[in-house]
Amino acid sequence: MPEPAKSAPAPKKGSKKALTKAQKKDGKKRKRSRKESYSVYVYKVLKQVHPDTGISSKAMGIMNSFVNDIFERIAGEASRLAHYNKRSTITSREIQTAVRLLLPGELAKHAVSEGTKAVTKYTSSK
């Protein structure tokens, strides 16, 4: 009858291999790379609109992808508009036109009015 396969002995608690993975040579822990996302801002808006509602991490991931996608579309369209008009700067006018082109009907109107309100608030606070 064959003998059962023996597993490798478990590494000791203070082994050198475990130490090098978690810590650098000078004894400091490695800094985790920061992953940028819009989750803080999505959460703030959610609490403004529905204070008693939460959001799952999966839903937050979807919202983050959505915001990134819309941002890229608006930036791309605004860039094309600036290029067509032989301009090297994207201004609020290009952004506004890009939003009007990308978003349908009533949604575009609301987005433009909220954007105008935000720009006015920003310029008045300077």
Curated annotation (Swiss-Prot):
Where N6-(2-hydroxyisobutyryl)lysine occurs along the chain? K6, K13, K21, K24, K25, K35, K44, K47, K58, K86, K109, K117, K121
Question: Would the keyword Mitochondrion be found if you checked this record's keyword annotation?
Answer: no
Phosphothreonine carried by residues: T116
Q: Residue positions of the PTM Omega-N-methylarginine?
A: R87, R93
N6,N6,N6-trimethyllysine (modified residue): where?
A: K86
Q: Which residues carry this modification: N6-crotonyllysine?
A: K6, K12, K13, K16, K17, K21, K24, K35
Q: Which residues carry this modification: Dimethylated arginine?
A: R80
For this protein, the record's Gene3D superfamilies field holds:
Histone, subunit A
| N6-methylated lysine modifications at | K117
> What keywords tag this UniProt record?
Acetylation, ADP-ribosylation, Chromosome, DNA-binding, Glycoprotein, Hydroxylation, Isopeptide bond, Methylation, Nucleosome core, Nucleus, Phosphoprotein, Ubl conjugation
Assigned protein family: Belongs to the histone H2B family.
Subunit field text:
The nucleosome is a histone octamer containing two molecules each of H2A, H2B, H3 and H4 assembled in one H3-H4 heterotetramer and two H2A-H2B heterodimers. The octamer wraps approximately 147 bp of DNA.
Protein name, per record:
Histone H2B type 1-H
Report the source organism: Mus musculus (Mouse)
